[in-house]
Amino acid sequence: MIQFTKMHGLGNDFMVVDGVTQNVFFSPEQIRRLADRNFGIGFDQLLLVEPPYDPDLDFHYRIFNADGGEVENCGNGARCFARFVRNKGLTNKNKIRVSTSAGKMTLRLERDGTVTVNMGVPVLDPSQIPFKAKKAEKTYLLQTPQQTFLCGAASMGNPHCVLDVEDVANANVAEIGALLTKHERFPRGVNVGFMQVVNSGHIKLRVYERGAAETLACGTGACAAVVVGQIQGKLDQQVRVDLPGGTLTINWEGEGKPLWMTGPAQHVYDGQIQL
């Protein structure tokens, strides 16, 4: 039997598994079955806690989408990861350092129960996002057979394009998201953010995630939106980001500096499952 915990960060929900004290392996097919909301546990991502590869770090953090594919990073998941390892007694630290396939992250448990995550320095060089463009720009034109879109692009360990919208509540997220997530200029696919700027310290955001469709919240998407908004001169250093599942606070001092994201991490239940 495998012990697991169901958690969520703003409704972005996870199956979290301790791979430190348990010997676990999940095939893509098993992950797809477990992710099914009718026949399985149901989740957006599976988070796996593994022992660190580097003695200076506390854990290795792996993320699998509901389609079974492994991805580089998940900000909402990182907050749940921090709360999980602390709740399960895998560490007694308030500041936790982890590696992911995209690099290293620092997670900080706050006194009010929220978790602050150092999301790293955003990548703006198109070749590193990866995104097909001659050079880094504030905005890019994305052409599709139906229409042309203006977007910003950045990577937070995973690729994002961000569109400015007048009214996020009525944005055609499902259709445009599905169209752009597989756009040929993003060789590894892309997460698509729909950003409404309320004022320079406040945005509303919906995100169509690569491999998962629209989710209630996307931490890396919130970071990417703030980066794009700041570069375009629309946003301040600290920004409140309202997502369908709740609110995150993002702090960024500008190019070359890491982003800090603060938000909740909720425990839902503990369970066990036979694979």
Swiss-Prot record:
Its EC number is 5.1.1.7. InterPro entries: DAP_epimerase_AS (IPR018510), DAP_epimerase_DapF (IPR001653). Substrate binds at N12, Q45, N65, G75, N76, N158, N191, E209, R210, G219, T220. It comes from the Bacteria. It holds the Pfam family DAP_epimerase. Keywords: Amino-acid biosynthesis, Cytoplasm, Isomerase, Lysine biosynthesis. GO terms for molecular function: diaminopimelate epimerase activity. Pathway: Amino-acid biosynthesis; L-lysine biosynthesis via DAP pathway; DL-2,6-diaminopimelate from LL-2,6-diaminopimelate: step 1/1. One of its GO terms (biological process) is lysine biosynthetic process via diaminopimelate. GO terms for cellular component: cytosol. The record marks Y269 as: Important for dimerization. It is an enzyme of class 5 (isomerase). It is found in: Cytoplasm. Homodimer. Catalyzes the stereoinversion of LL-2,6-diaminopimelate (L,L-DAP) to meso-diaminopimelate (meso-DAP), a precursor of L-lysine and an essential component of the bacterial peptidoglycan. This is Diaminopimelate epimerase. The lineage of its organism: Bacteria, Pseudomonadati, Pseudomonadota, Gammaproteobacteria, Alteromonadales.
